[in-house]
């Protein structure tokens, strides 16, 4: 009798989470909360949104980038957060974890584009970019982790 492990793992919205410098980042995180991670030390860039009414902004330093979009409610919403240090996912992946560690934690049902491995939830419709989590790799070792929130496609 032989049993093989299931390489498919179910991705839940709660899996789209990472702790950066001790602050939890999820698809529901407020931009103000995320800005506390920077401790006031970040650069800002902005551009008129092609999809939303208002300005899209990027807040970044050497190890963290936060991308936002203007919501229909007038508030600034998280589009994507990308961390290169002091980060751990809800399933225990950190900088320096191997691709095998990622597969053990998240399964093998991912999309690989170059050196980026992505796991996504289904989008609510075909006009949306799906929420997901991704891992940037170098020699199959994690060098950055990102979370993407569902948002309108451009």
Q: Which residue stretches match the model-derived regions?
A:
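C-terminal motif of bacterial Sec signal peptides marking the signal peptidase cleavage site
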Residues: 2-3
